[in-house]
C-alpha cells in the first residue's frame, strides 16, 4: 500500500503505510534474525523514505545473510534488491556496477525486469544502463 500511495502522490498516506510495514518487519527480524527477506524489504522501504544509511545497512545485511557465494540461485535476489536500493537513493555508480555484474550471471537480472522496474527510473537513461538493456534484449 505504501508503494501504491507513493505512486499516486499521496505522500502522507504512503508514509503511514511504510511506517506500519517497518514496525512489522522489525518484529519479524527479531523473530527470524537470519531471514534476508525481511532485511531487504526493510531496506527498500527505508530507501523510499529517504533514510539512505538505514536502507543500505538493511540491504547489505540481507546480502551478508545469503550471499551469492553461498546460494547461487537465491543469493542474487538480495543483491538485486540492493542495486534497487542504491538506485532509489541516488547512488547511481554503485547501482550500475551491481546491475552490470548481476546481468552477467545466472539468476541475475533479465531484460524485462530492468526495463519495467520503477526502482531504476533514476538511472534508466544512463548509457551504462542502456548498454546492459541492449545486451540482455532477447533476439527475435
Enumerate the language-model features and the residues they cover.
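Alpha-helical protein-protein interaction modules
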Residues: 1-140
